[in-house]
Amino acid sequence: MTTNSSGKPAGGISWRTYLALCKLKVVGHIVFTAIIGMFLAVPGVPPLDTAFWASLGIGFAAASAAALNHFLDRHADAEMARTQNRPLPSGDIRPAQVVGFALVLGIVAMAILIAFVNMLTAFLTFLSLIGYAVIYTVYLKRATPQNIVIGGAAGAAPPVLGWCAVTGSVHPYALLLFLLIFVWTPPHFWAYAIAKRDDYAKVDIPMLPVTHGIAFTQLHILLYTILLFLAGLMPYVTGMSGEIYLAAALIFGGIFVYYAIRLKRKADPRLAMQTFAYSLVYLVGIFSALLVDHYIVL
């Protein structure tokens, strides 16, 4: 089979198009937090075969949800400058092909989790997939400016899925991990929404900066980062983690609050994007600290 320089088979669809549908950066963060959940669930090292299959299944499910999101948002994506080059608006692939790809990924994900992990993890992963791809994308995203607050539950599930994959149960500590991502999600997305407010307004998506204004959103980003700072202390307060984690939580959380204060004082799209970028650093940093603290006792 011949291919052109873009990796596209003659008369076919480029493999890069399928990768773009999967939103690999998002999937990477999801699998990362799920893996952290697996390692935190046990005193030593989790069964590596279970960790492998769980990571693969959760990753495939996340990619399936991402592809469905491409399909369901295709009309809005065609109108927004930042998304016009996505596979569907650019005409690289047909809607039916995207749906088929998403279904295959979803079926494979469920088969892996049922066969090699456990039914509870498969069930919770399926709920997360539906929560993001259907409940959030189809309804919440266009129904309320609190879309990302309510819909954030699906995005906060991965560490719970990882924990459940190893233990077969949902522990209160796993719910603390859920809480961290759940509270992190609004300031993360709202900072981005400030920078891209005009795009969202153009397609009538009621993100908070569109419906309530920039100043209102800036205030709520600050309030949520303060709440996140406090939530970030909970693993230490409850005895889940120790001093290494506490130091990281204070540093990473304090810097996030600092960014939020700067953003509150100045409505600057560049500063909003810097805050958005740091929120990703925070998430990786705080979960990495949880892992390090789990294995190193001072």
Curated annotation (Swiss-Prot):
EC number(s) given by UniProt: 2.5.1.141
GO MF: protoheme IX farnesyltransferase activity
Recorded metabolic or biological pathway in which this protein acts: Porphyrin-containing compound metabolism; heme O biosynthesis; heme O from protoheme: step 1/1
Cellular component GO terms, alphabetical: plasma membrane
Superkingdom as given in the UniProt entry: Bacteria
Membrane topology qualifier: Multi-pass membrane protein
Annotated keywords: Cell inner membrane, Cell membrane, Heme biosynthesis, Membrane, Transferase, Transmembrane, Transmembrane helix
GO biological process: heme O biosynthetic process
Transmembrane segments: 26-46, 52-72, 98-118, 120-140, 148-168, 174-194, 214-234, 241-261, 278-298
Function statement: Converts heme B (protoheme IX) to heme O by substitution of the vinyl group on carbon 2 of heme B porphyrin ring with a hydroxyethyl farnesyl side group.
Further comment found in the protein's record: Carbon 2 of the heme B porphyrin ring is defined according to the Fischer nomenclature.
Entry protein name: Protoheme IX farnesyltransferase
Organism, scientific name: Methylococcus capsulatus (strain ATCC 33009 / NCIMB 11132 / Bath)
